[in-house]
Amino acid sequence: MAEITRTSQVPKISRDQIVKIEFWPVDIPITDPFVVATGARVVAENIFVRITLHDGTQGYGESAPFPEVGGETRDSCLTTLRQLAATLIGESAGCYALLAAEMAQTAPFHPAARCGLETAMIDAYCRSTQIPMWQLWGGQDVRSRETDITIPIATLEKSVSLARGWYAQGFRLFKMKVGNDVDQDIRRLEAVHHSLPGISFIGDGNQGFSREECLAFAKGVRRFGGALVLLEQPVVRDDLDSMTAIRRDTGVPVAADESVRSLADARDVIAQSAADYINIKIMKTGVVEAVAIAEATLAAGLKLMVGGMVETRIAMGCSFSLVLGMKGFDILDLDTPLLLATDPVQGGYGYRGAQLEPWHTSGLGITTLPQSDLTTIE
């Protein structure tokens, strides 16, 4: 890794000066195997981050690598965190945007690691100024919001069983993981459709379809009368021509997910009219760049979706803060804490069925306790 070039240094001790950074691995079982077209997880192998400021304020962040999607592993994140954390000691948390840009220069291929530090910095800064994190982004849309629920790739019977359980809790928008077998994917959606009235589907291919397979999938869902409201990343990330063709030939809106891992990627998708939505995920880009991508998306007249990897309410709370702070997020895919067997976080936003409920305390409003294998940088 290259060394960060210092563009500013805090000349005197300030109340928001970073004095200590701690991080530790957390293993959280996933209730049902999280199977997507590119791989499967049964345990969320994440990292929690805590930053302490000179005035004693503490902020929390989370790194949630998903190797099958982003290429990062927990080990690579831990290595990157050790290197980047040392560069933040003595800096002002209020300079989070500048520090995020410097970290992106130094570790461009480790966004999940950077995201953990960015989130903790921003959380600490918001707590020190006594504002909820969503207020930092404008506080323009503070209200309860509905999320979808994810059904992983599974047998037909398991898919129906999972969907019925979530339906009973109030979920009506089902994000179906697809992309392994077109015929089986169609059968799974059809079985869920006939089991539950008044539902809609997102088909999330995770790059698993070819153009022809995706067209066949959309046609098959239309044939049985399913409400397919979105096709998320149906083909490989660089195949923007197919994304454009799928939009045109199916009439179903398309969301770019893996295709957008940077602001430059977002501009390419926009220029080629390859998507109707861009899916904002802080683990793909870090928090500050996610905000820039969201702003560029809205300015270009596209719509916003927000999602995540397999995250707890720390990272997901940061993403929800963008929804509450900025206008324009139409589709929320902020469900992964519900897929975990335990919740290691106290406070913050909450779930009421399919509704996410805002919080009004400072920062993310959450706390959690360090576990074993604690690393401290000061």
Language model features with spans:
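Short helix/strand-capping turn motifs
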Residues: K327-T336
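N-terminal capping/lid subdomain adjacent to the active-site entrance of alpha/beta enzymes
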Residues: A2-F201, N206-L215, K219-R222, D249, ...
